[in-house]
Amino acid sequence: ELAKKYFLYTSFADLRTSATKEVLAKAARFIRLLIEPLSKLVARTVKDDRLRKVLGYPAVFLGSSPYLTPSMYHLMSHLDLSDGVLYPMGGFTRVIESIADIARTAGVDIRTDSKVTRIVTVDGLATGVEYTDAAGTSHTLTADTVVSAADLHHTETTMLEPSEQTYPAEYWQKKVPGPSALLLYLGVKGELPELEHHTLLFMKDWQEGFEAIFGHEPTVPEPASLYICKPSGVDPNVAPEGYENVFVLVPIPADPSIGSGEIDGDGDPRIERLADKVIAQISDWTGIPDLAERVTVRRTVGPGNFADELNAWRGTALGPAHTLKQSAFFRAGNVSKKVKGLYYVGGSTIPGIGLPMCLISAEVLVKRLRGDTSAGPLAEPLTPVAAPQPRPWP
């Protein structure tokens, strides 16, 4: 609770707001939570190997390994176990659509299919951006403030002159990327009662799997630990009747040379071979012998997709890993030190990786722009939103 109260919603612009009596009274514990890896805290807390893996696996969604992630991030499991796991009906697309709806209602002009090519600066001041639209036409958009939600490495090293870069190429040479991922989007005929809404399949020696991904010579672990989501079990919006929607995440090294995925097996050969093995693994481990034959829709995504389509540094699926030196106030800040009026949000900056923290990064920036150095979150309106009705399927 203290981590959430004092360290998750702050830009660390004024450390005094986090150095309260409440925090100082537990300073020794905070320091231990920062320097001790999550795996050690979990090992002290529970003895069952399965529980240790369940409590350690959230490190993957922080772009790291439980053997590298500071144990402060056990707060992710705390949120899951205390607040429960929520699901937006209609899928996560609805979250993004809702944000867009709110923005447009507030008068925001959202321009999609447009690639920003340069942040325009004059005498060290950000004055706008240059972008190319879907037709290939170049435009210049003036602005009093520029906020980049793009990959921070891409923003700094391709949109700014070297003299304007707070985080130049040499900065990234010393950083550790979070893992990339092999993603499988599957449409499967028939029901899959063998799978829950959320299913985790763990390697027996999962430390070996993490060492394969984060070691000095990264390799793809085989077999791998998998996360499987079957939202169609609760949401009729995501699959036609008689079919299941299945999403699979396989953590793999951040290396674009592993390849890119595509639709219906047309991705790079290595990616498609890995996908075949993953489907076979799910089939074997969960007792669905005919799973491969029942797949009617298949799309794969690999590190090359993250690098080429999202400009992700080294093809990471998440951002810089949450190691000690890349967490909390050691992580890249949300304001440029070289260009006035240039700010950052997203998984590359504070507070870090994951959809909740990316959304919090926007909140932290709002506070910074307002001159609010408080450590806690902004007040929430908590207006209820009705769930969408099921869509007709062709």
What is each of the regions a protein language model found here?
Residues L75-T137, D144:
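Helical element adjacent to the flavin cofactor pocket in flavoenzyme catalytic cores
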Residues D48-L62, P221-C229, S283-P351:
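A glycine-rich dinucleotide-binding beta-alpha-beta segment and adjacent secondary-structure elements
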Residues K189-N305:
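C-terminal segments that line or cap access tunnels to active or ligand-binding sites in enzymes
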Residues G347-R370:
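A conserved FAD-binding loop/helix module that cradles the flavin
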Residues T121, R370-P394:
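Active-site-proximal substrate-binding core of FAD-dependent oxidoreductases
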Residues T117-P240, A386:
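Mid-domain catalytic core of redox enzymes
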Residues K53-L86, S336-K340:
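Active-site-adjacent "gating/activation" loops or surface patches in catalytic cores
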Residues E1-L68:
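Rossmann-like flavin
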